[in-house]
């Protein structure tokens, strides 16, 4: 089986399991980027605990779902965002979030993976990876 975009597979798996009201989701293949995105989602309160399982091939991640994700998905192509663009909320950011106060854009910055709100607070830019609300 070929996995082209592990982050897109992970976010789609979380969304599908939330819509089926499952208590947990199994994400495969595991990657450092997916784990960092899950840490941001956990910090913002969208998912519960998660655990990496090494199966000898590509690894799995088991995520406990809290039922708080209404929609999540990848942003493709991955847009670069400057600090000023995160504050101004340009059109493509408005496209993914229902409101200015609801949801987060997950951004990869030079300081690591974080939400767009935290990146704006730290005054750094980055690349938009995905959205959650």
From Swiss-Prot:
A Pfam family: Ribosomal_S8
UniProt-listed GO biological process terms: translation
Entries under Gene3D superfamilies matching the protein: 3.30.1370.30, 3.30.1490.10
Keyword vocabulary terms for this entry: Ribonucleoprotein, Ribosomal protein, RNA-binding, rRNA-binding
Gene Ontology terms, MF aspect: rRNA binding; structural constituent of ribosome
GO annotations of cellular component type: cytosolic small ribosomal subunit
Entry-linked InterPro entries: Ribosomal_uS8, Ribosomal_uS8_CS, Ribosomal_uS8_sf
SUPFAM superfamilies membership: Ribosomal protein S8
PROSITE patterns tied to this protein: RIBOSOMAL_S8
Protein family membership: Belongs to the universal ribosomal protein uS8 family.
PANTHER family per record: 40S RIBOSOMAL PROTEIN S15A (PTHR11758)
Known role: One of the primary rRNA binding proteins, it binds directly to 16S rRNA central domain where it helps coordinate assembly of the platform of the 30S subunit.
NCBIfam families documented for this protein: PRK04034.1
The protein's assembly and partners: Part of the 30S ribosomal subunit.
Protein name: Small ribosomal subunit protein uS8
